Amino acid sequence: DHLVEIRDLDFAYEDRLILDGISLQIPRGKVVAIMGGSGCGKTTLLRLIGGQLRPSRGEVVVDGQAVQRLHNDELYALRRRMGMLFQFGALFTDISVFDNVAYQMREHTNLPEELIRDMVLMKLNAVGLRGAHHLMPAELSGGMARRVALARAIALDPMLIMYDEPFAGLDPISLGVIGHLI
């Protein structure tokens, strides 16, 4: 059973072909790394899987759904079941670490605030930042901000988590925490 299937996929930015004839299958429950040089299309592939881009040709299927054929409401429903940690996973700068992680829970569920509180603290604890819940993003180091972004990505226990350059620019402690969680 495959969580993600990519079939004969092409993608171009205007006339510049980025991905040409890509096919791959990602099984459920496995960690899969897509590796390659700068500019070879790794981030583009993740954006295609998440439905942020549409292929020029071919098909992206996630959990049995052809992503490029989904209407907006169906695509949003699928994305709620995905966690994405992109290289520049920006946090909302005007709300606390706690509220950054709680955002998806408040936006996409009807959970009571007490349960959201417990879940947020559990996710922050998982990334080693339980004591940082009251801080604002401007008060965080780069590694701490990436760990908060990871806590946000895993907030709703997604079926699929996509990481883009998850270790770029991390200090040794953050690298160890994120590597262990992946």
Language model regions located:
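Helix-to-loop junction immediately C-terminal to a conserved catalytic motif
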Residues: 50
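ABC ATPase NBD coupling module
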Residues: 67-83, 113
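Conserved ABC ATPase signature
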Residues: 136-140, 144
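Conserved ABC ATPase "signature" region
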Residues: 65-66, 113-132
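Conserved catalytic motifs of ABC-family nucleotide-binding domains
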Residues: 157
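The feature captures the beta-strand-to-loop junction immediately N-terminal to the Walker
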Residues: 35-37
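Catalytic Walker B motif of ABC-type/P-loop ATPase nucleotide-binding domains
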Residues: 161-164
